[in-house]
């Protein structure tokens, strides 16, 4: 579970930026649509956008899921959800912490975690919670529409192997939390790691602690 201070810090950062977020980063729309297509959710399935912000992938997910599917968009910042609603983004919306999701075990087919992990005080706990709600074989994308270098520069930092999305740290965390990394795109235009949910009965052979 994120602490109150961690949630507050996230809200303080995003709330004043919510109203013009999509305008400032309008060039990212196709990248969100592309990662939604890569995740390839099943027709009629359930997609979770954890830390959805303004839910920029929701329309692409709805197109893939068809009329019987469902996109669930959760964020801790009300202002971002309000901006998503004003933009007419589809799906259901709710305020929820990605480390304490109001969802049943093994209820979700696909998860998008876009820009999420760097804002969690305990990213490993977040990945474990995402694994809890995902069906065996379900897929997760840890995604940023810009490179790690550009993301660090946006926050006046330089990339480090200690960063939550640095492959040297992220890949072991994924394995330890019930995911099997399938692909890594640590490129100049985006960051995207896609992983599959390991069936719980197989975890004993992967995780030793």
Please state what every model-predicted region is:
Residues 124-136:
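A short glycine-rich, Lys/Arg-flanked "PGG" loop and its adjoining helix->strand segment in the class I
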Residues 67-68, 134-139:
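Short glycine-dipeptide loop
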Residues 186-209:
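Core SAM-dependent methyltransferase catalytic element
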Residues 142-144:
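Acidic carboxylate diad motif detector
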Residues 48-100:
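Class I SAM-dependent methyltransferase SAM/SAH-binding core
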Residues 162-178:
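Short alpha-helix
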Residues 1-43, 56-60, 79, 83, ...:
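Conserved class I S-adenosyl-L-methionine
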Residues 112:
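A conserved beta-strand element that flanks and buttresses the S-adenosyl-L-methionine
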């Amino acid at each position: 579970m994120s602490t109150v201070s961690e949630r507050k810090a996230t809200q303080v950062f995003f709330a004043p930026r919510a109203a013009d977020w999509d305008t400032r980063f309008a060039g990212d729309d196709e990248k969100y649509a592309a990662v939604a297509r890569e995740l390839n959710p099943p027709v009629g399935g359930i997609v979770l956008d954890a830390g959805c912000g303004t839910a920029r992938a929701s329309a692409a997910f709805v197109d893939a899921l068809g009329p019987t599917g469902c996109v669930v968009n959760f964020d801790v910042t009300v202002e971002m959800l309000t901006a998503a609603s004003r933009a007419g983004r589809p799906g259901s919306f709710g305020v929820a912490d990605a480390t304490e999701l109001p969802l049943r075990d093994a209820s979700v087919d696909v998860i998008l975690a876009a820009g999420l992990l760097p804002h969690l005080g305990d990213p490993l706990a977040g990945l474990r919670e995402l694994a809890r709600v995902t069906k065996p074989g379900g897929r997760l994308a840890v995604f940023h529409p810009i490179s790690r270098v550009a993301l660090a520069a946006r926050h006046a930092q330089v990339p480090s192997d200690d960063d939550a999305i640095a492959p040297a740290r992220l890949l072991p965390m994924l394995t330890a939390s019930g995911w099997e990394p399938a692909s890594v795109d640590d490129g100049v235009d985006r960051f995207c790691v896609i992983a599959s949910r390991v069936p719980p009965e197989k975890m004993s052979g992967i995780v030793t602690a």
